[in-house]
Amino acid sequence: VRSRGLGDVYKRQHPCALAVENGEVYPGVAVCGSGNGIGMTLNKHQGIRAALCWLPELARLARAHNNANILVLPGRFIEPEVALQCVDVFFSTDFEGGRHQRRIDKMPVEGCGC
């Protein structure tokens, strides 16, 4: 576990995204009020697939079908027990590959300078 601390939550997400992209940590978990702002910030990074999840089944599908590498939790809208279940499922689910990998291969924006 590596905490990026509190404060300007959006600024702190760039080091989190870079740590996941560079393989320093994998996968990542980010939490904010709704999860939307953090998810949008993280997904600006080309190598990040951050998934906003509030149910364990969403966390499973994010990993299995989208190979999400950062779990985003909406702190104001999720009970702590459910959040921990989401983390457990996210960390224990493998990516299925196959047709899902072909979809992921279409995600990067070429020539954007990202």
Question: Where on the chain are the PLM-derived regions?
Answer:
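C-terminal binding/interaction regions
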Residues: 56-114
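Conserved functional loop/turn residues at catalytic and ligand-binding sites
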Residues: 5, 24, 66
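Short, structured active-site "lid" loops
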Residues: 11-34
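Single conserved hydrophobic/aromatic residue that forms the stacking wall/gate
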Residues: 1-10
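Mid-chain, well-packed structural core segment of small domains
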Residues: 30-31, 36-76
